């Protein structure tokens, strides 16, 4: 084994000198396992980041360097950080190094481990067909459909329903498609991760999910690499098992933020707004591995924090370049009791074109957006002058727009324990048919409230019958 000694410690960045001229490669994992004089054991992993010359490498620690001293012996493992992959990861919670951090014991030693650093799939391996991923959530499937193997950005503030939407997507894909999900908490609040784990355990979704966390309190090295740990687990399900995998990353901004911290500690010259000069490269290396191949697909849903609501900030701007669809959650809609609170006018998708979704779906989606846009324009007039001042045509637009707005809401399976109402999965063809019939005026005589928090249009008719009885 190639051994060296610690020569300098600067917080999470540690320099190690190797004698004999044999240096570990970039990205190799180095380990320290020893006890201190006071009896506390130090068990650390570093990742090689730079070769400095004079037989010295600069490394980034994956956990706190408290108690580490100069002269400590360090061992080169000869390979990159490797994490468990395969069915043994399902229902479990891991840290960046692939160590289990739940209460179900260690992962068996014979479980296969893969390195977290690898190349994106070769050009000829990529799948060229664009296929829609049916989520069973009406507003998503109709107005901003997700692409299998695509990347989706989920924008929203605190408490507007990002987590519930994520859970429902995990649930629907597990139930309807038998799919597997990987959740990577990057720079997450520990409390949120804990809540998510317990909520998923209660709803039974956890059995089809692997979870990886690098929380806010961890060093930047761990927060920067934890997304790659989750991605490596997802890649195994895609490449070795031919699965269509869902990869959730919350929050992709924290990945960039951790990279910025590491870059400064490594002594690189900062670029715009203090970010790392390698921002676009690091983001590209992560995002290009998330794709569809001839074997299977990884569809990634990423929560995106926008610093100070500035979309021109280099971090969100770099993320935008990789996204195929955006789902915007709006607080105003939660106040109206419309869940999921997806903004139908601000959410976008590359897949919403007649060639991909079909002519009928495209036409219905555009008419829905036009009706809602017109309603939005009329709201000022209604607020000042009231409904009576509108033309008959505009009154009809408002009448239908309100029904559409309520019909975009839906009961979720994962929210059954709160609402007491059964969740619903709506196939795309039923969604398109329902909205088409509303636009044609088929249900103009039904009360507005019949459209609230329902699945298909049949449920609306049932609700209306009960109300009118």
From Swiss-Prot:
GO cellular-component term (any): plasma membrane
Catalytic activity field: ATP + H2O + 4 H(+)(in) = ADP + phosphate + 5 H(+)(out)
Residues at which ATP binds: 156-163
The protein's enzyme class: translocase
Membrane topology: Peripheral membrane protein
UniProt keywords, alphabetically: ATP synthesis, ATP-binding, Cell membrane, CF(1), Hydrogen ion transport, Ion transport, Membrane, Nucleotide-binding, Translocase, Transport
PROSITE patterns noted in UniProt: ATPASE_ALPHA_BETA
One Pfam family linked to the record: ATP-synt_ab
Molecular function GO labels: ATP binding; ATP hydrolysis activity; proton-transporting ATP synthase activity, rotational mechanism
Keyword Cytoplasm among record annotations: no
SS bond partners: none
UniProt-listed Enzyme Commission number(s): 7.1.2.2
UniProt keyword Cell membrane, yes or no: yes
Protein family: Belongs to the ATPase alpha/beta chains family.
Oligomeric form and interacting partners: F-type ATPases have 2 components, CF(1) - the catalytic core - and CF(0) - the membrane proton channel. CF(1) has five subunits: alpha(3), beta(3), gamma(1), delta(1), epsilon(1). CF(0) has three main subunits: a(1), b(2) and c(9-12). The alpha and beta chains form an alternating ring which encloses part of the gamma chain. CF(1) is attached to CF(0) by a central stalk formed by the gamma and epsilon chains, while a peripheral stalk is formed by the delta and b chains.
Protein's job: Produces ATP from ADP in the presence of a proton gradient across the membrane. The catalytic sites are hosted primarily by the beta subunits.
Annotated protein name in UniProt: ATP synthase subunit beta
Lineage, opening ranks: Bacteria, Bacillati, Bacillota, Bacilli, Bacillales
Gene: atpD
